[in-house]
């Protein structure tokens, strides 16, 4: 089985995805604001880069999959939705692309 990074693992779809992947025998690197292997705020550019760096360190630069489940929705401000759901996801996908290419 492979090593897979899942964002949003503290609750909801991210938590369920992590549980399913672990049950299938995968190693999961969870990312969330808290209660995760890598904790950080995807709305903040500095945290995005740190998350990428920490995931890369944990996976040894080789990642077999990425499931970006982290996200927010109303009633939070639209600006926060865009920062997390768009820019946060884009930064994680782009930042982990080299590790995914090796997996």
List each language-model region with its residue ranges.
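N-terminal Rossmann NAD(P)H-binding glycine-rich loop of SDR-like oxidoreductase domains
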Residues: 10-19
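Rossmann-fold cofactor-recognition segment
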Residues: 31-47
């Amino acid at each position: 089985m492979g090593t897979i990074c899942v964002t949003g693992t503290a609750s909801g779809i991210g938590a369920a995805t992590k549980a399913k992947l672990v049950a299938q025998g995968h190693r999961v690197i969870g990312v969330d604001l808290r209660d995760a292997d890598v904790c950080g705020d995807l709305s903040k550019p500095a945290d995005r880069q740190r998350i990428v760096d920490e995931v890369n360190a944990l996976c040894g630069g080789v990642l077999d999959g990425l499931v970006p489940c982290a996200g927010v929705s109303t009633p939070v401000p639209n600006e926060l939705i865009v920062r997390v759901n768009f820019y946060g996801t884009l930064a994680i996908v782009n930042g982990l692309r080299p590790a995914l290419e090796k997996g």
